[in-house]
Amino acid sequence: ILKNFMNKILVEVSVGELFDKISILEIKKDKIKDKEKLKYIVDEYNLLKEQMVNKLKPNEKLSGLFDTLKDINSKLWVIEDDKRLCEKNSDFGEKFIKLSRDIHFLNDKRASIKLEINNQTGSKIKEIKEYTSY
């Protein structure tokens, strides 16, 4: 238990991680309808978006990378929903396997885009991934 309770913790993150989080929050703003949940989503989105606007100079390259990241995260959202439906129906056949593989490949692409954002912005923090080759 924290003795000094804080309502938020400030942590430095890479620019790619910030873009990723904001893109996911934008998707949540569109997908989630529960008003109480939406309030928390909007509050977090506004806080993070303000940091992005205040700390980064917008340009076409970064905007394109953000859009690509959001597109990947949107696809992941749909695939995760479909995979949960397979789980609910105990359907672990070809569709489930394809969805699982799609998540794997999209997450690799997502990591690549985040690294490119970090490189483009000179982010001092970079998320480094290493996986078994396939």
Predicted features along the sequence, with ranges:
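Short, Lys/Arg-enriched N-terminal segments with co-localized hydrophobic residues
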Residues: 1-5
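Anionic, Ser/Thr-rich low-complexity intrinsically disordered regions
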Residues: 6-134
